[in-house]
Amino acid sequence: MVVLGSTGSIGKNALKIAKKFGVEIEALSCGKNIALINEQIKVFKPKKVAILDPNDLNDLEPLGAKVFVGLEGIDAMIEECVSNLVLNAIVGVAGLKASFKSLQRNKKLALANKESLVSAGHLLDISQITPVDSEHFGLWALLQNKTLKPKSLIISASGGAFRDTPLELIAIQNAQNALKHPNWSMGSKITIDSASMVNKLFEILETYWLFGASLKIDALIERSSIVHALVEFEDNSIIAHLASADMQLPISYAIDPKLASLNASIKPLDLYALSAIKFEPISMERYTLWRYKDLLLENPKLGVVLNASNEVAIEKFLDKEIAFGGLIQTISQALELYAKMPFKLSSLDEVLALDREVRERFKNVARV
C-alpha cells in the first residue's frame, strides 16, 4: 500500500496496522517531519518516498528509495505505484489532487483527508473510497443491516476544547487553549476544527456524499467519544455504534476489512463504565458556525468555501494574528458571501480556482 502523510497521527497508526497485518509499504510521503520519515524508511523500506520541500532533500535518508518532491511529486509517485490501495492522510486541500490521482489510477482510496470530499465530493467515485474516521466507519457498520430501512444518520461530536468555556470568553481564546482537546490527541488543525465545530460540518458533508443525500443528516454531542454514530430507521428504532476512542479501528478496516474483522485493534469497552453517556444538542450559541449546517446540506458545493476560509483562518489563528472569534468571523463572512453566488464546479480545476479565490479574498483578515 501507499501511505500519504505517514508522519501524522493517522499515518503513524496506519503503519502500525500495516505492520501487524503484514502489508508491504510501497511508498511514503510526509510534509516537514524528515526525522520521522527517515525512521519509517528504515523500518518499512519503501521503494518510493515523497517530501514537500526541496530544502529538506539534504536531510532525507531514502536508503535507495526513489525520491519525489512537492505536490506534483506526490502525483507522479502515485502514477508510478503499483499498489492497489492508497491511504491519503495529507492534511488540508493539499490532499485533494492526490485523491483524484489515486482514483484516476483505479486504486482503492482509504480517505482520511476530509477536504477531498468536502471540496469535491461530487467529482469523486465514492464506490472506490473507504472513509478513515470513527463516525463514518460507525455509519458504515450500522448500514450493513440491509433489512432495516434508514431514515436519518447521526454522528457524534466531543464538543472540543471550548465545550465548557463561559460563552463570553470563547471569542478571545487563543490557539494554545484550542489545542487542549478533552478526549483525543490529534494534529493541530483537526483539534482546532473540533473546537470550532468545523470538523463536524466537514463530516456532515462527507456523510452526504458517502451515504446519500436523501437521508436526514445531523450531529449531536456525546462527550466521552464512545458513541460514534447512530442510525434511525423508518420503524423509529435507533441503533448506535459504540467503540473505544481509537482511530486504529477505522484504519484497520480501510486497510483490510477481512483481517480487521478477525483481529482486535482496539481495547474492549467496559460496559459497566458507560453510565456517563449522555447526548446533548449542538448549541448554536456556543458553536455559532453550526447554524450553517442546513445551508451546506442544501448547497454542498459550498464546502470548498468552508474549507478554504477555514484553512486561511486557522493559519492566522496559529500565527496569533487573530483570536478564536476572528476565526469564526472569517468563515461566517465567507459562507454568507458565497451563498449568494452561483457556481457549478464541474471540474477539479474549477474547484481549485474557487479555493484560490476564497483564500485570496480572505487572507487579509482584520485582527479580531
Curated annotation (Swiss-Prot):
Pathway assigned in UniProt: Isoprenoid biosynthesis; isopentenyl diphosphate biosynthesis via DXP pathway; isopentenyl diphosphate from 1-deoxy-D-xylulose 5-phosphate: step 1/6
- Entries under InterPro entries matching the protein: DXP_reductoisomerase, DXP_reductoisomerase_C, DXP_reductoisomerase_N, DXPR_C, DXPR_C_sf, NAD(P)-bd_dom_sf
Spell out the coiled coil positions from the record: none
User: GO terms for molecular function, please?
Assistant: 1-deoxy-D-xylulose-5-phosphate reductoisomerase activity; manganese ion binding; NADPH binding
Pfam families linked to this entry: DXP_redisom_C, DXP_reductoisom, DXPR_C
Reaction(s) the record says it catalyses: 2-C-methyl-D-erythritol 4-phosphate + NADP(+) = 1-deoxy-D-xylulose 5-phosphate + NADPH + H(+)
- EC number assigned by the record: 1.1.1.267
Q: Which residues bind NADPH?
A: 7-10, 31-33, 113, 115, 187
Keywords in alphabetical order, please. Isoprene biosynthesis, Manganese, Metal-binding, NADP, Oxidoreductase
- Write out the residues that bind 1-deoxy-D-xylulose 5-phosphate: 114, 134-135, 158, 181, 194, 199-200, 203
Q: SUPFAM superfamilies recorded for this chain?
A: 1-deoxy-D-xylulose-5-phosphate reductoisomerase, C-terminal domain, Glyceraldehyde-3-phosphate dehydrogenase-like, C-terminal domain, NAD(P)-binding Rossmann-fold domains
GO terms, biological process: isopentenyl diphosphate biosynthetic process, methylerythritol 4-phosphate pathway involved in terpenoid biosynthetic process
Annotated binding of Mn(2+), by residue: 133, 135, 203
Cofactors that this protein relies on: Mg(2+); Mn(2+)
Judging by the UniProt lineage, the source's domain of life is Bacteria
EC top class, as a word: oxidoreductase
Q: What does this protein do?
A: Catalyzes the NADPH-dependent rearrangement and reduction of 1-deoxy-D-xylulose-5-phosphate (DXP) to 2-C-methyl-D-erythritol 4-phosphate (MEP).
Q: Which family does it belong to?
A: Belongs to the DXR family.
Q: Which NCBIfam families match?
A: Dxr (TIGR00243)
Q: Spell out the HAMAP family in the cross-references.
A: DXP_reductoisom
Question: What is this protein identified as?
Answer: 1-deoxy-D-xylulose 5-phosphate reductoisomerase
Q: Which organism is it from?
A: Helicobacter pylori (strain P12)
